[in-house]
Amino acid sequence: MKTALTIAGSDSSGGAGIQADIKTMTANGVFAMSAITALTAQNTTGVTGIFETTPEFLGQQIDAIFTDIRPDAVKIGMVSSAELIGVIAEKLRAYRAEHIVVDPVMVATSGSKLLRDDAVQALTEKLLPMAEVVTPNIPEAEILSGMTITDAAGMEAAAKVISEKYGCSVLCKGGHQINDADDLLWRNGSGKWFHGKRIANPNTHGTGCTLSSAIASNLAKGYDLDTSVERAKAYISGCLSAMLDLGHGSGPMNHMFALKGEFVGE
C-alpha cells in the first residue's frame, strides 16, 4: 500500500486541515500519516483559537514518520511561522522526500493575510523550491507572483512567473474568482487548463486542503502530475456533489461519498 504524509494544522471540526487530508488520502487509496503544525479550535463559522506546535516537536513527528513508514508523497498545508517552515525544509531535505505538494495557505477567505512577512519569505525561499507542485488560489498567486490577476490570461502570466522563480510546477486555482471550477497547471514552460463543472454547493470548507491531498495521494500511487490533478479534481467534484449539509456556516464536504461496505450502512 502506498503512503502519504500531511504536514498541516488540525481542524477540530473535521472539515479542513489534517482531518480533511487524512480522509482524502484514505478515500484515494493510500495510507495516511500526519505531522501537526498547530492545533486549532474552529468550526464552520470561524477560528476561535490556535495553539502552535514547537519546532522541536514538529521535527520529532517528522523523524518518527520517516524512520519507520516512509511516505511516498508529502502534502504541506498551513504552517504559520518561519521557524516551523525551516524545520520542515530541513527534515524533508535530509530524508530526500519525494512528490512534495505545497498548498501555500497565506490568505484567509476574508482576504486578510495569515502569515507574517518572515514566514512568507521562509515559505518562498525554503519550501517552494522543494515542491513538485504548488497549489495557490488567486490571492496567494498574486502574492507569490507580485501581480494582479483579473482573468485567465493573468492566471497564466502569474503561474509562469511563480514556476520560473521557484522551479516548481504551479496549479493556479480559479475558484469562484475567475473561471468557477477551471484550474491552470503550469509546468515545463507551458500551461494546461483543467475545466470543471460548477457545483452550486455553499459548503466548501476544506476544498483547498482536499485538492492538494488528493493530488499527493495520486502522485504517491505513481500517476504523473497531469493525471494526478485530473483525478483530484474529479474526486473533489464528487465530494461537493454529495451535498453534505452540516454546521451553521460554510460546512464540510463528504470526503467518503464513495465509501461502500458492510460497516457503512446505518
Label every PLM stretch briefly:
Residues 3-6, 26-109:
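Conserved N-terminal subdomain of the carbohydrate kinase-like
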Residues 19, 142-143, 201-225:
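Short, small-residue alpha-helix embedded
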Residues 52, 226-266:
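Charged C-terminal helix
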Residues 117-191:
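Conserved phosphate/ATP/ADP-binding segment of small-molecule kinases
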Residues 7-13, 191-205:
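Short pre-catalytic strand/loop immediately N-terminal to key active-site residues, enriched for Gly-Thr
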Residues 29-33, 192, 218-232:
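Phosphate-handling active-site elements
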Residues 14-30:
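N-terminal basic/disordered segments at the start of proteins
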